Swiss-Prot record:
InterPro entries, per the entry: PsdUridine_synth_cat_dom_sf, PsdUridine_synth_TruA, PsdUridine_synth_TruA_a/b_dom, PsdUridine_synth_TruA_C, TruA/RsuA/RluB/E/F_N
Function: Formation of pseudouridine at positions 38, 39 and 40 in the anticodon stem and loop of transfer RNAs.
Protein name per Swiss-Prot or TrEMBL: tRNA pseudouridine synthase A
Enzyme Commission number(s) from the entry: 5.4.99.12
Gene of this entry: truA
Family membership: Belongs to the tRNA pseudouridine synthase TruA family.
Pfam families to which the protein is assigned, alphabetical: PseudoU_synth_1
Organism of provenance: Cereibacter sphaeroides (strain ATCC 17023 / DSM 158 / JCM 6121 / CCUG 31486 / LMG 2827 / NBRC 12203 / NCIMB 8253 / ATH 2.4.1.) (Rhodobacter sphaeroides)
Residues the record marks as active site: D52
Alphabetized NCBIfam families for the sequence: hisT_truA
Length: 255
């Protein structure tokens, strides 16, 4: 059966996450339903990352096996036609070798978290950023973030129910971009690693927000990391500011 990789964009707001749910809308379920309208099913797709409820994606990757050969351009177009009016888009499709696996072949995942500092409620970005009503110190947040880059035991920064075999991960990059706007300042956290623990990004950003607000010192981030205790973590940031922006492979399947 021919295998295809799909690059996917979605607004996570209406969905109970990526993973198929019995009685709730999911991104996986929406795409599998669309595939079933192209070819007899059942269809099961596998993704590089299983995003949680409310988390968005601009560069999710999944793969599926189909019965017949499809022109990738036509496959993407046909799926998009059947996905309407849901906020899900197949940005690209590509024929890939049968050994390609969206999750297990991945060597890098990239996330963006958008944090907006302004007193007024957000309007155009409602559901797409985390807004806090107080100013933040970006240099303090950068100093705190520096403690987290590299290979560490991230027990403090993972969900209590995380099923990963080990809490040790290598965070390859954690950078902070400041975007000044007429109606507020947006802080964009860019994170890159081979893989992440459940709630790791949201736990990190929630903790760094406390540093930016002056409630924590940058050195307290290191103390929390060294504690290897979930109770030492700062607040977990809400999901709506988080985006899966890209997945890296040894060879780009869409090139």
């Amino acid at each position: 059966m021919p295998r295809y990789a799909l690059r996917i964009e979605y607004d996570g707001g209406p969905f109970a996450g990526w993973q198929r749910q019995a009685a709730q809308a999911s991104v996986q379920g929406a795409i599998e339903t669309a595939l079933g309208r192209l070819e007899p099913g059942p269809h099961t797709i596998a993704a590089a990352g299983r995003t949680d409820t409310g988390v968005h994606a601009s560069g999710q990757v999944a793969h599926c096996d189909l019965v017949r050969e499809w022109d990738p351009f036509r496959l993407a177009g046909a799926l998009n036609a059947h996905l309407k009016p849901l906020p899900v888009a197949i940005v690209a499709a590509a024929r890939v070798p049968e050994e390609f696996h969206a999750r297990f072949s991945a060597v890098e995942r990239r996330y963006l978290f958008r944090l907006l500092a302004r007193r007024a409620p957000e309007v155009h970005d409602r559901g797409r950023v985390w807004r806090v009503p107080h100013p933040l110190d970006p240099e303090a947040m950068r100093a705190g973030a520096a403690h987290l880059v590299g290979r560490h035991d991230f027990t403090t920064f993972r969900a209590a129910g995380c099923q990963a075999a080990s809490p040790v991960k290598t965070l390859d990059a954690l950078t902070l971009e400041t975007v000044e706007g007429m109606n507020g300042t947006e802080y964009r956290f860019h994170l890159r690693a081979r893989s992440f623990l459940h709630n790791q990004v949201r736990s990190i950003v929630g903790t760094l927000e406390r540093v930016g607000a002056g409630a924590w010192t940058p050195d307290q981030v290191r103390e929390a990391l060294d504690a290897r205790d979930r109770a030492a973590c700062g607040p977990v940031s809400p999901p709506q500011g988080l985006y899966l922006t890209g997945v890296g492979y040894p060879a780009d399947p869409f090139a």
